[in-house]
């Protein structure tokens, strides 16, 4: 399956929530939709939750399964560890820092070699950042309008596990967030049940 690049509103309406962030068209389409909902099977509910998580984090099936397998081999609750791994992805942390409006935009910044880890350029969006590492903006990218505009609007104190330094346009990944800290509306246990079949 290829990465979805179609209208985000259509997907958000399917799940009945703003999984991609603010969307003016969402409330209009969602309120005007009067389709009768069919009763969904247990498998359907679990599959839907997995698809929602994949859309939110912009991860394809093979990668998502790889994260699940890694989580299932780890100590701790598999579903929680899965979300913690997704939260530790470089593209997600660039998004959480406020350098990008969306994770898709963050992925582009990473792929175009605008982002560094401990002063080394990393262009792999799925790179897993370790606590203590510093995510920065490459010197030549610090004047990019898209980054500057996003930083003006960003709330740098929103996530306690990211310590942002305005002067250097960088942030330290302090610690892996607990489940209660992760704001995404995902029922991770349903995903665990789906993969455990």
From Swiss-Prot:
The keyword Secreted does not apply. GO terms for molecular function: rRNA binding; structural constituent of ribosome. The keyword Ribosomal protein applies. One of its GO terms (biological process) is ribosomal small subunit biogenesis. SUPFAM superfamilies: Alpha-L RNA-binding motif. Keywords: Ribonucleoprotein, Ribosomal protein, RNA-binding, rRNA-binding. Coiled coil: none annotated. Residues 88-150 form the S4 RNA-binding domain. InterPro entries: Ribosomal_uS4, Ribosomal_uS4_bac-type, Ribosomal_uS4_CS, Ribosomal_uS4_N, S4_RNA-bd, S4_RNA-bd_sf. PROSITE patterns: RIBOSOMAL_S4, S4. One of the primary rRNA binding proteins, it binds directly to 16S rRNA where it nucleates assembly of the body of the 30S subunit. With S5 and S12 plays an important role in translational accuracy. Part of the 30S ribosomal subunit. Contacts protein S5. The interaction surface between S4 and S5 is involved in control of translational fidelity. Belongs to the universal ribosomal protein uS4 family. This is Small ribosomal subunit protein uS4. It comes from Azobacteroides pseudotrichonymphae genomovar. CFP2. The gene is rpsD.
């Amino acid at each position: 399956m290829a990465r979805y690049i179609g209208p985000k509103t259509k997907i958000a309406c399917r799940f009945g929530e703003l999984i991609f962030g603010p969307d003016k068209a969402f409330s209009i389409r969602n309120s005007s939709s009067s389709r009768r909902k069919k009763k969904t099977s247990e498998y359907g509910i679990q599959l839907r939750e997995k698809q929602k998580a994949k859309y939110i984090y912009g991860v394809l099936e093979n990668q998502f399964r790889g994260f699940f397998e890694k989580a299932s081999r780890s100590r701790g609750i598999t579903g929680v560890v899965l979300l913690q791994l997704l939260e530790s992805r470089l593209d997600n942390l660039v998004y959480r820092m406020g350098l990008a409006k969306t994770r898709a935009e963050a992925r582009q910044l990473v792929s175009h070699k605008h982002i560094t880890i401990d002063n080394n350029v990393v262009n792999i969006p799925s790179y897993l950042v370790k606590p203590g590492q510093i995510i920065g903006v490459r010197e030549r990218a610090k004047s990019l309008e898209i980054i500057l505009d996003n930083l003006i609007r960003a709330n740098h104190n929103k996530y306690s596990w990211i310590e942002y330094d305005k002067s250097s346009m960088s942030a330290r990944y302090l610690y892996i967030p607990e489940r209660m800290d992760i704001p995404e509306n995902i029922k991770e246990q349903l995903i665990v049940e789906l993969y455990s079949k």
